[in-house]
Amino acid sequence: MKYTEIKDKTAAELATMLKEKKVLLFTLKQKLKTMQLTNPKEISQVKKDIARINTAINALR
């Protein structure tokens, strides 16, 4: 996900995307601890997506 895809969205859409990504991050961390995660790099990608969404939310303020 790129910032250019995010910056045109509304605050409500960004809030729902942020919630979804945080839930995804939680499940990925759980899978990592139970040795079910095949690609650990997914965690860092989701963290970066969360940071991009937060940046877009702060830009709207």
Curated annotation (Swiss-Prot):
HAMAP family hit by this protein: Ribosomal_uL29
A GO CC term attached to the entry: ribosome
Keyword annotations of the record: Ribonucleoprotein, Ribosomal protein
Keyword Repressor applies: no
Keyword tRNA processing: no
GO molecular function, one term: structural constituent of ribosome
UniProt feature coiled coil, ranges: none
Family: Belongs to the universal ribosomal protein uL29 family.
Organismal lineage: Bacteria, Pseudomonadati, Campylobacterota, Epsilonproteobacteria, Campylobacterales
This protein's encoding gene: rpmC
Species in which this protein is naturally found: Campylobacter jejuni subsp. jejuni serotype O:2 (strain ATCC 700819 / NCTC 11168)
Gene Ontology BP, a term: translation
Protein name per UniProt: Large ribosomal subunit protein uL29
